[in-house]
Amino acid sequence: QLVHTQIDLEMSFCDEEDVFAIVEGIISAAFKAVNGLEVKGPFPRLSYDEAMERFGSDKPDLRFGMEMRDLTDLVTESDFSIFREVCASGGRVRGLAAAGCAHFSRKETDELADIAKIYKAKGIITLKVEEGQVKGSVAKYLSEDAQRGIVKRLQAADGDLIIMVADDPEVSAISLGQVRRFLGRKLGLIREGDYKLLWVTEFPLFEWNPDENRWEAKHHIFTQPREQDLPILESDPAGVKGRLYDLVLNGVEMGSGSIRINKPDLQKRVMKIIGTTAEDAERKFGFLLRAYEYGGPVHGGLAIGFDRLIAVILGLENLRDVIAFP
């Protein structure tokens, strides 16, 4: 497509390490050609679970810190009803410390709450750190041990603003992650010309669709599950991780790929979990399943959005500035 350029790799007899090595070489060459920067591999790696726990995003921006922490165990027994109810229902209380932001006005904290609400959170809870103690309307409901534990876990210091979200596990992570992202820009924590690359790996293979009351493939149905998860494929789809990986640059997904299924029996198992009948599998994918009966090589790949990559390297916000026919 003239309006969109993609570098698509399809490789046989490969594993993740082979794909990573080739892509890191491509990215290093692109940086050198576009702006003369030396970017060397191997790039850092985070599992999907770790990225969500620490940054509230599957494409985290590593150009600044302000990492999130799970505070659930510290507030489970608190007298604050919201904390207690969220913990009892299996939710999570997560927090971060915004350095030097205890002076934030009500208008500024309301702005943070509005961002969290966009991502389905009911709101935020804020505490200020003064002389090693937390101050705020919720502080009186927290024991001294809980207060000290929160300050220690978040590595908060005097003058910091502690921001917490108590909600469903996914909502609390994503909404607080977006607050973190906003603060990174608002506080000027991102240096111009700074580039942070990483791989995010081991995404969930399936996600639940409550509207249709069934499992769906999080990316696509041809992704190979991790071998250690095969025993729980049918019994615990939520716990199955795929051999999936994304390349992330400065909080933007640059490319996505996976190691594919190459065995017909495994492909049929995955199809069955998402509700594909044997008849539909044959009608839609019979050619593929029959081909695998003859033996297909282990294969995988990745696709890089070339225009997006160049835009981020050049520090441009709009893809129209780098494509041939905008």
Language-model features: locations:
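Class II aminoacyl-tRNA synthetase catalytic cores and aaRS-like
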Residues: 1-326
